[in-house]
């Protein structure tokens, strides 16, 4: 799996686990809906660490907790 796909799946998983929507997450973390939609739809090919950090703030988790998922275990280089 590529990194961008792992990030996309992790965001969707965290939203589902917290019973929130991607739209609500935009409000919580201050990311534009178009940016988050591009990430979660797979159109964005280069999500920055700064964006992931903002998502973590909105999700109330640490950056290491975001990456603590089997999605990131066997990434393609």
Feature annotation, model-predicted:
Residues 1, 38, 67-77:
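Short, charged recognition helix plus adjacent turn
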Residues 31-46:
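Recognition helix of helix-turn-helix/homeodomain-like DNA-binding domains
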